[in-house]
Amino acid sequence: MERIFDEELKALKGRILALGGLVEEQVQRSIKALVERDSDLARGTIEEDHRVNRMEVEIDEECVRLIALRQPAAGDLRFLTTAMKIVTDLERMGDLAVDTCERALELNEEPPLKPYIDIPRMADAAQRMLKEALDAFVNRDAELARKVCRDDDFVDDLNKQVFRELVSFMVEDPHTITRAIRISFISKYLERVADHATNIAEMVVYMVEGRIIRHMVP
């Protein structure tokens, strides 16, 4: 019975990684749709969101089934409750990719305001944080999880930098206000993606060490 449970947990990890990979791809596609002004890609990415939602529900149901059926001890129980929280964060990241695509569709109907430089940097950093947070989860690596928490400051700083630059555009030319606000939304969405990756990392520390580090300096 224990061997069967171990196999079930291994399969669950694989499904969570698959969902994480899909979400990472959704974020990447949303930024590509923005930078390359590809509205077809934006619409296609929005249509793919149902896969993220379906996988989130299926994984959540599997976690509940395993808790009820296997009645896991402390360590495995923390793993399963952490997994349930992680897939919720992943689903919300998918929603943020959809939000980004919706703003991209609006921006693609207007002349470009400026070249996108910091937005792709934010996206790269947020995707890296997500990948490392999931690696930390699978490998039970609390130190890597703490690194993800620290990396969140970089994305926060970029978001502030983008906002300051956009304010300058709006002050100098009121005609840019609508476009600048839409870009600022996208910057905020990416900051929130990084925040969700940080949430996952914090939960990994709890899973591994039984310590809650939210609102603490890692």
Question: What kind of feature is each model-predicted range?
Answer:
Residues M1-P218:
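Cytosolic, long alpha-helical scaffolding segments
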